[in-house]
Amino acid sequence: MPRQKYEQIYYALKERIEAGDYPVGGLLPSENVLIGEFSCSRNTVRRALANLVRDGYVQTRQGWGVCNIYQPIETSAYTMGTIESFAETARRTGQNSATRVVLFTTCTADEALSRRTGFPVGTELFYLQRVHDLDGVPRIFNHNYFRRDCMPGLTKEIAQGSIYRYLEQVVHMSIVTSKRTITVEKAEALDRKWLTLDDFNCLAVVSSQTYNSDGVMFEYTQSRHHPSIFRFQDNAVRTAARTPAAML
């Protein structure tokens, strides 16, 4: 599907910002200049700029214009706004990656597992333990649960590559959304077995429930990250405070 005009402007400006065409702290071209360049309406330009504000690339300054505030994400950053496979994250951050499947089995969700993962009791599941290496060093230990009826052909060999690539390109599943929780937890025996924690006694844990386009939760994953490489980075926008009159 062709991109709408505001999306074309958004991506064009985003690429320029990331390439350093506009200095950090400097102003982007004015609305009138962008209207002339892209042959569009003022509302279209403003919609594109609003998306850049939302994504943390620019900030509007009343009476001045639109200011570039983009800072490149460090390679250790874990971003929350997108759903990425481990291999995709490694490519984005310029690191070499490898995945080892240290356990590949099946199980059925009982009440305890249902409460922990969100799968209904009785759901037939694949259960995997995987170790993700970055630049040859084990950095992430995963507990993966996948619905077997959503991917009956999953194998250990596939799991050593990219499961998401298999789901999207072979199963033709559309992966839509993921609910995530980040906690800090004490290191367990398996963490110490598979990750080189040294003097660290805790790690960052990202628990995610991922859904496909049919609204089916097909995956629950608990990713246990080495503290030295985990850094949460997101972009938050404060909405205007409600006045007392507006609260009435």
PLM features: what roles do these ranges have?
Residues 1-42, 248:
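Extreme N-terminal segment that seeds HTH/winged-HTH DNA-binding domains in transcriptional regulators
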Residues 64, 86, 163:
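A generic "binding-loop/recognition-motif" signal
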Residues 4-6, 30, 67-82:
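Short, cationic-aromatic polyanion-contact patches
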Residues 53, 59-60, 71, 84-87, ...:
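Extended, compositionally biased flexible segments
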Residues 49-50:
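Short, hydrophobic-biased segments on the C-terminal half of alpha helices
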Residues 22-25, 54-63, 69:
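Beta-hairpin "wing" of winged helix-turn-helix
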Residues 97-248:
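C-terminal all-alpha effector/ligand-binding and dimerization domain
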